[in-house]
């Protein structure tokens, strides 16, 4: 099974990275930038291809990927034409605008390699079988979407559905169809079609790749764009991204909001795109006069296009990710871009310092006001009303909620002291450095949203956190993601200060020793040059290799952060917060006797599969059987709860099937649908909220009901053959 998991990981990585990378490179974007933004662009290309081929009547993976390839060819063609029209020098200045020396591919690969290994250990520890699934109503819906795409070849997010096009019309109980952000579902469905693996496994692989690769690489790239381009920061990133319980562990444990998880994981990469785009809009003071003149009038159109596609990709993953992205980039605009723009305009038009300050103040107020205006407008639009008016009834007093932010216990109220210490060191460091200052504002904004999401004042709750369903789990995840870069800076700053102090002490001792002795040929060879290259003694070799030693310390610190034991309680072995997160993740994925879809039910279903083959099986979705199509390919009738637009035969079957022996109307419905069997599992733990005995009164069948024959039974589980219509 784990070999199949590895195969699926490779396929999903190819789907997430190759199309986007080729498209970005076709536009002339640098290799490393193309690699970072590839998942966003790939999702956008797959999404638009799915929409484009639908009205053409094209179905399946081949037309979908063919459309993606066509978009790449169009991009390459346009880039070639532009290159021919413009002078070579102008093209070169546009190509490099905002990208020069911004990202280091080696450090990104280091982060990706270590983070993948770390999260695989976490994943394997919690989810011991990659075909286990999170047992929740939302996840059953996600799996139904994926299965429908696999069976129908339809990938349009404008026509998302549980059944339509997947089966014959008379075997399609519900016809509801509409918009749904299906990026995760499309990637999983394509991976299922290519590999032949089940939808449950490929769904797990998509969110695994998002968390293990896309998220850490995005954070590492973000740190590089603001100047933290070194091995220590890259190594720390691999550990710190998993050190906060609120994200990713809690987000993949509760609600089954996997599309939201995928979107949040891609936000750092989208922020990187935005920063690179704006970096080209205003020249750096450190650039030469010629470079400033070249870039003063232009914004890299390639990065603008990619940024727009990145924003659309976030919406295709989950629209709430776009609002989180906006929360992250607004502080960058206010704290970094606008001051640089003001300085540039001040120099260009020789404005006085007073006028420059006034200009900055006006631009800051206008930008902030515009942002608030857009926020209020969207908050009151009709298409977002179901989201922003949804209320999670979880309430915590503001001071108590703020305290959980300070100690990073967040919603679970389990303080993570080591993470908190690193963060607050980083917070001070960011305040003192103007290049990092915006990170603190982004964190504070997410913290306010989180505290507001726990408020018992509904207008406040709705205004601040409505775009995230007022869900404190999601807002806590945003706090964690916003805190990660700051915590990494705090750790890197601490390690650097310690090693700088050691380096200073060694140099001081050596210098004093050399002054008090005659210099021999051996001692003279031990002098310390500015870069340490001439050092040969042990202390000086320490200085020479302090970068490697710092990385080793970073690994040790990262291991401490992710320790399964609460270090404060040693020698007693108490679980750490991360260990609890792994335990909780296991509890919602592993089928047990207390879960909706039990281990014993799974054994019964495997036996039933040998009997039913491809025949249509009527089932009660409230007993957990609605996932069997995705898990084993069983041709079940109901893989979703009751929807609005329903097949007339479905209404008859779910309300009157137990009358099949004597009711001609029911017999006709059974014949028309082709139903042959009825599968009944345990209803003690209903999969979906609701009165199953009301909606599925026709499936209240016992061994004494005429018209059915028991073909398999174990305890309360039954597989009946419908004999009344034979």
Give short role names for the model-derived ranges:
Residues 45-49, 117-127, 152, 234-253, ...:
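Membrane-interface helix-loop junctions at the exits of transmembrane helices
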Residues 291-319:
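Membrane-interface alpha helices of multi-pass inner-membrane proteins
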Residues 288-293, 325-366:
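Perimembrane helix-loop-helix junctions
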Residues 116-265, 285, 294, 582-597:
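Active-site lumenal/periplasmic loops and adjacent helix-entry segments of GT-C-fold
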Residues 11, 17, 512-515, 555-726:
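Extracytoplasmic
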Residues 340-343, 417-440:
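Hydrophobic, aromatic-rich transmembrane alpha-helices
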Residues 7, 56-64, 129-139, 196, ...:
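Membrane-helix boundary/interfacial segments in multi-pass membrane proteins
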Residues 1-101, 526:
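Membrane-embedded, hydrophobic transmembrane alpha-helices
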């Amino acid at each position: 099974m784990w070999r199949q998991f590895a195969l699926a990981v490779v396929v999903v990585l190819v789907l997430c990275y190759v199309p986007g990378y080729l498209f970005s490179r076709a536009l002339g974007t640098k290799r490393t930038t193309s690699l970072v933004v590839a998942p966003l662009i790939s999702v956008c290309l797959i999404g638009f291809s799915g929409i484009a081929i639908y009205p053409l009547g094209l179905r399946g993976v081949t037309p979908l990927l063919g459309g993606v390839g066509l978009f790449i060819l169009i991009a390459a063609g346009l880039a070639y034409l532009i290159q021919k029209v413009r002078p070579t020098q102008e093209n070169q200045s546009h190509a490099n605008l905002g990208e020069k020396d911004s990202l280091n591919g080696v450090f990104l690969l280091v982060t990706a390699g270590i983070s993948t290994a770390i999260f695989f250990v976490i994943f394997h520890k919690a989810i011991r079988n990659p075909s286990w699934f999170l047992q929740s109503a939302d996840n059953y819906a996600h799996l139904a979407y994926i299965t429908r795409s696999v069976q129908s070849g339809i990938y349009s997010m404008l026509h998302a559905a549980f059944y339509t096009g997947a089966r014959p019309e008379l075997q399609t109980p519900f016809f509801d169809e509409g918009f749904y952000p299906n990026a995760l579902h499309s990637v999983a469905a394509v991976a299922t079609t290519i590999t032949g693996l089940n939808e449950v496994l490929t769904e797990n692989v998509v969110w695994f790749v998002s968390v293990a690769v896309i998220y850490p690489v995005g954070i590492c790239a973000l740190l590089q764009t603001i100047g933290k381009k070194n091995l220590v920061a890259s190594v720390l990133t691999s550990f710190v991204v998993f050190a906060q319980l609120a994200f990713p562990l809690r987000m993949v444990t509760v609600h089954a909001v996997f599309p939201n998880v995928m979107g949040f994981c891609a936000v750092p990469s989208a922020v990187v795109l935005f920063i690179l785009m704006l970096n080209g809009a205003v020249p750096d003071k450190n650039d030469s006069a010629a470079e400033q003149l070249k870039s003063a009038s232009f914004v890299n159109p390639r990065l603008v296009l990619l940024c727009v596609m990145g924003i659309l990709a976030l919406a295709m993953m989950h629209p709430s990710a776009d609002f989180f992205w906006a929360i992250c980039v607004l502080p960058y605009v206010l704290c970094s871009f606008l001051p640089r723009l003001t300085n540039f305009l001040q120099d260009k038009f020789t404005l006085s310092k007073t006028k420059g300050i006034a200009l900055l103040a006006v631009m800051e107020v206008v930008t902030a006001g515009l942002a608030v205006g857009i926020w209020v407008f969207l908050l009151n639009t009709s298409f977002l009303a179901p989201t922003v008016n949804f209320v999670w009834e979880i309430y915590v007093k503001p001071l108590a909620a703020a305290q959980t932010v300070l100690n990073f216990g967040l919603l679970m109220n389990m303080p993570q002291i080591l993470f908190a210490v690193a963060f607050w060191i980083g917070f001070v460091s960011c305040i003192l450095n103007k290049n990092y200052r915006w990170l603190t504002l982004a964190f504070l904004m997410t913290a306010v949203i989180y505290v507001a999401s726990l408020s018992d004042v509904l207008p406040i709750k709705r205004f601040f956190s409505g775009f995230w369903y007022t869900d404190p789990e999601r807002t806590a995840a945003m706090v964690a993601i916003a805190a990660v870069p700051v915590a990494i800076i705090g750790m890197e700053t601490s390690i650097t200060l310690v090693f700088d102090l050691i380096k200073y002490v060694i140099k001081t001792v050596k210098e004093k020793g050399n002054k008090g002795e005659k210099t021999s040929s051996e001692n003279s060879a031990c002098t310390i040059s500015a870069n340490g290259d001439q050092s040969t003694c042990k202390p000086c070799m320490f200085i020479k290799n302090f970068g490697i030693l710092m990385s080793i310390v970073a690994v040790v610190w990262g291991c401490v952060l992710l320790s399964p034991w609460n270090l404060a309680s040693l020698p007693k072995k108490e679980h750490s917060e991360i260990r609890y997160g792994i335990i909780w993740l296991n509890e919602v994925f592993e089928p047990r006797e207390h879960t909706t879809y039990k281990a014993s039910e799974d054994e019964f279903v495997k036996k039933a599969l040998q009997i039913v083959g491809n025949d249509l099986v009527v089932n009660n979705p409230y007993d957990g059987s609605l996932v069997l199509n995705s898990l084993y390919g069983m041709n079940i009738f109901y893989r979703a709860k009751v929807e609005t637009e329903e097949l007339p035969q479905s209404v008859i079957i779910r309300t009157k099937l137990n009358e099949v022996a004597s009711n001609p109307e029911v017999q006709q419905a059974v014949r028309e649908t082709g139903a042959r069997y009825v599968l009944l599992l345990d209803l003690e733990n209903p999969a979906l909220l609701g009165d199953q005995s009301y909606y599925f009164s026709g499936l209240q069948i016992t061994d004494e009901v005429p018209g059915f024959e028991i073909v398999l039974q174990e305890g309360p589980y039954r597989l009946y053959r419908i004999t009344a219509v034979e």
